[in-house]
């Protein structure tokens, strides 16, 4: 079950399958981003789009990732994650290997409290709380 990075030239072929998977993640907080903004960010290179396939099932999952450089770390930030099998160890291991190949030393994501258990199953730990105020 390989993970593939989707390059801009493959977007017309892959996006119709990946978009509904990512939309499920967007639906958890529709005020944060739209699927059109995600597509634009991928095409501009702000986010990388990864998809994974299952034999005889085709594309079953998608994730968007960006990289943030800090003095001590290069962080792979997962923005959206959707589809089947996202908590399977081999899926997460392959995604982490891709992140390492791109220089990341840590991976992170922001999520609502109800998703913390899912990410903990993947081996992630809850390290911060994000506080926000409207300006």
What function would you assign to each model-found segment?
Residues 28-47:
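Active-site rim helix/loop that mediates acceptor-substrate recognition in acyltransferases
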Residues 44-86:
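Conserved donor-binding loop and adjoining core beta-sheet/short helix segment
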Residues 73-122:
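Acyl-donor binding region in acyl/amide transferases
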Residues 39-40, 66-69, 97:
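Short, flexible, glycine/charge-rich loop motifs used to bind or transfer phosphoryl groups or to couple energy/partner
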Residues 47, 121-125:
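Short glycine-aromatic motifs
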Residues 1-33:
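Short amphipathic alpha-helix that is part of the acyltransferase structural core
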Residues 110, 125-135:
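Conserved catalytic-core motifs of GNAT/GCN5-like acyltransferases
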Residues 20-25, 35-36, 50-54, 79-80, ...:
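N-terminal start-of-chain detector that recognizes signal peptides
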